[in-house]
Amino acid sequence: MPTPPVSALVAQMGEGPAPLYARVKQMIIQQIDNGSWPPHHRVPSESELVNELGFSRMTINRALRELTADGLLVRMQGVGTFVAEPKGRSALFEVNNIADEIAARGHQHSCQVITLTEEAAGSERALALDMREGQRVFHSLIVHFENGVPVQIEDRYVNAAIAPDYLKQDFTRQTPYAYLSQVAPLTEGEHVVEAILAEPEECRLLQIERGEPCLLIRRRTWSGRQPVTAARLIHPGSRHRLEGRFSK
């Protein structure tokens, strides 16, 4: 189905009493709902919408910001605004492989390894991993992508004594989760979930606007009685949600 030009959509907005930004939102939602703008479709830029619709940049910006906050659009810094995929889901009470979660949605997983180093544990890492300060830990920083869109920063510290070959692995071929499940099978996990505003470097890696809300999961895992890893998992709020079910 060919995508109609923005100028052809103006007539669909109607007059009505609704504020101008709300009418712009409704026009965009209509294009998404009827399939004219499918997931990953590039939305016209603010300048294009201003020129075509004749509304102020402030009006257009508010409409796009609110649709992004609602999870219908994804704004990628320096690239543009796109129709979002339905949000990726993770189980709140489970520890899963992100590559498997993405594959289960019928999508392609890829990743970029930013950091893979050995460090001496500072007080925070030593406490999290139940070790002495100065002991060896491995640090990996990896960005995970779903169909080419960044969906998670994985900032992980690993007890080097438990996984001594961690730095030798090619994590573009298997995730840290998959490797660690082989050498130190998970017996216990801990999740702490927070809403945060991403730091500038995190925004750059996730290709989001500065100050965009993100979901932070602090995860620790054990194999037997020994903590194996402590990780920070950062997801853009517009691209991810957590689900959980429990019985009493």
Curated annotation (Swiss-Prot):
Residues annotated as domain HTH gntR-type: 18-86
DNA-binding region: 46-65
GO BP terms in the entry: L-histidine catabolic process to glutamate and formamide; L-histidine catabolic process to glutamate and formate; negative regulation of DNA-templated transcription
Presence of keyword Transcription regulation: yes
Pfam families: GntR, UTRA
Protein keywords: DNA-binding, Histidine metabolism, Repressor, Transcription, Transcription regulation
Metabolic or biological pathway, per its Swiss-Prot or TrEMBL entry: Amino-acid degradation; L-histidine degradation into L-glutamate [regulation]
InterPro entries from the UniProt entry: Bact_HTH_transcr_reg, Chorismate_lyase_/UTRA_dom_sf, His_ut_repres, Tscrpt_reg_HTH_GntR, UTRA, WH-like_DNA-bd_sf, WH_DNA-bd_sf
PANTHER family (UniProt xref): MANNOSYL-D-GLYCERATE TRANSPORT/METABOLISM SYSTEM REPRESSOR MNGR-RELATED, TRANSCRIPTIONAL REGULATOR PHNF-RELATED
Protein name as annotated: Histidine utilization repressor
Record organism: Pseudomonas putida
